[in-house]
Design a protein with these regions (language model features):
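Flexible hinge/capping segments at coil-to-helix
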Residues: 111, 120-141
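Acidic, polar ligand-binding/catalytic clefts
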Residues: 87-117, 122-123
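Short loop->beta-strand "edge-of-pocket" segments that line small-molecule binding or catalytic clefts
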Residues: 35-46, 132-152
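Ligand-binding cleft/hinge of the Venus flytrap
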Residues: 52-62, 132, 144-146, 150-173
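A ligand-binding cleft/hinge motif common to bilobed small-molecule-binding domains
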Residues: 89-101, 182-212
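N-terminal hydrophobic or amphipathic helices and topogenic motifs
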Residues: 1-75, 81-85, 101-106, 126-131, ...
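Periplasmic-binding protein-like
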Residues: 110-117, 127, 201, 205-223
Length: 223
């Protein structure tokens, strides 16, 4: 399957592309080089599935050099729209994805599906069960940054339920990854956070309360 996909997309074998050695601080130089070569720029936040995909693409005999730019869903699509990336990894509904890349013919591939839900301390001492619990004045949350899927998911819920973000304790505490919000719960800096399931299990100190299954898309411009 890997060979047929490579030939169908017109990708040359890795041996035909020699990527110059750039110093660590020159990631922008590497990005610009790959944008104008046979390399690949992929934007998306960390996930085990995405890391596995990138590693396999890089080591496959007909693979290509891949540079991952760590961005949330919104910023990944923004980069795709302005041609600063070849692939955006986004976990939004199709209508939102297409609205953020207007006038561009897109191809979408569902890479995987995952559970989004609540991170809570082991044993769930506050007996949290859903996002409505965030409105309780005694509950402090660790929030994600604007443009990330957990933040968009939470903001859509608050809007639909006519709940003011100002009433949510910790709403303006913005962290930039699911790992960091999970760590905030594990270290008792907050009571709960919303995020992808894998991060809850890494510390061994948290329980995960699933709320919904979401798709993770690879979004590409159709040539």
């Amino acid at each position: 399957p890997g060979n047929s996909g490579a030939s169908a997309s017109g990708i040359s074998p890795m041996s035909s592309l020699q990527v110059p050695e750039f110093p660590p601080e020159s990631s922008l130089l590497k990005r610009d080089y790959l944008l104008h070569s046979s390399g690949l720029i992929l934007c998306g936040q960390f996930s085990p599935a995405l890391e596995l995909l990138i590693s396999q693409m890089s080591i496959h005999p007909q693979g290509i050099p891949v540079l991952q730019s760590f961005m949330n869903s919104y910023n990944s699509l923004y980069s795709l729209y302005f041609k600063k990336a070849h692939i955006a990894c986004a976990s939004l509904d199709l209508e939102h994805i297409r609205s953020l890349v207007p006038g561009v013919q897109l191809s979408l591939l569902c890479l995987y599906e995952y559970s989004i839900g609540l991170y809570v301390p082991s044993g769930n001492p506050l007996k949290l069960s859903g996002l409505m619990d965030f409105a309780c004045k005694d509950i402090k949350i660790a929030n994600r940054e604007k443009g990330s899927t957990p933040r968009i998911y939470l903001d859509q819920f608050l809007f639909s339920e006519k709940i003011s973000p100002a009433s949510i304790s910790g709403y303006h505490t913005e962290l930039v990854s699911d790992i960091s919000t999970a760590a905030a719960i594990a270290t008792h800096k907050a009571d709960s956070a919303l995020g992808e399931e894998y991060a809850a299990h890494q510390s061994g100190l948290l329980d995960f309360i699933p709320l919904q299954t979401l798709p993770m898309y690879l979004v590409m411009e159709t040539e």
